[in-house]
A protein has these predicted regions:
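S-adenosylmethionine-dependent methyltransferases
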Residues: 1-167
Length: 167
C-alpha cells in the first residue's frame, strides 16, 4: 500500500483550519465543502466554526473512515463523498482546499474549476505553504501563519502558510 499522505496534517490544511476558526464568519451559517479533505481537519474546523452543513470530499477510499472517526471524536456532524468533484458545480457557499497545489497536472485541473466556482458565487479559500504550482493570479491573501510541520514531510520544521481567496 502507498503511504497514507492524506492522513497527515499538511501545512496548507493546518493554516486553513486555523483561519476558519479565527474567522468564523467565513463559514458560519454557510454550506461548506472541504475538497481533498484527507483526515477531515479543515472540515472539522468548519463545523466547529458554525457552518450550516459540511461535506468532506476525497477520492481516496481510506479517508471516509478517518473523517468519520475524527468528526465523532470532535463532536461534529460531517457528510462525506468519494465523488470526483473537479469541474463540477457544487451545492455550497464555500469551498475549502488545503495544500492542493503540489502537482502541475492537478493544479491545471483545479485552477479553472476554482475560477468557475468563484464566478458562480462560491467563496474558494485555499491554504498553501508556497507550493510550486500555486497560481500567481486571481488570488487575495487573507492571512499568514507559521505552521509546525513534520520533518518526514517537509524540508523544515515550520512552514509559512498563507490562506488565499480566489477572485
Amino acid at each position: 500500500l502507498p503511504p497514507p499522505f492524506w492522513a497527515f496534517a499538511w501545512a496548507g490544511g493546518q493554516g486553513l483550519a486555523r483561519y476558519v476558526l479565527d474567522h468564523t464568519e467565513s463559514v458560519s451559517g454557510k454550506r461548506v465543502v472541504d475538497f481533498a479533505s484527507g483526515s477531515g481537519l479543515v472540515a472539522i474546523a468548519a463545523a466547529k466554526a458554525g457552518a450550516a452543513t459540511v461535506l468532506a470530499a476525497d477520492i481516496d477510499p481510506w479517508t471516509e473512515t478517518a473523517v468519520r472517526m475524527n468528526a465523532g471524536l470532535n463532536g461534529v456532524d460531517i457528510g462525506f463523498t468519494h465523488a470526483d468533484l473537479i469541474g463540477r458545480a457544487i451545492e455550497a457557499d464555500v469551498l475549502l482546499a488545503g495544500d492542493v497545489f503540489y502537482d502541475r497536472a492537478f493544479a491545471d485541473l483545479l485552477v479553472p474549476w476554482f475560477i468557475n466556482l468563484t464566478d458562480r458565487g462560491v467563496s474558494v479559500l485555499v491554504g498553501d505553504p508556497g507550493r510550486a504550482y500555486l497560481p500567481k493570479q486571481r488570488l487575495e491573501a487573507l492571512a499568514t501563519y507559521q505552521v509546525t510541520v513534520s520533518r518526514a514531510l517537509e524540508d523544515s520544521e515550520v512552514k509559512k502558510t498563507t490562506v488565499w481567496r480566489f477572485l
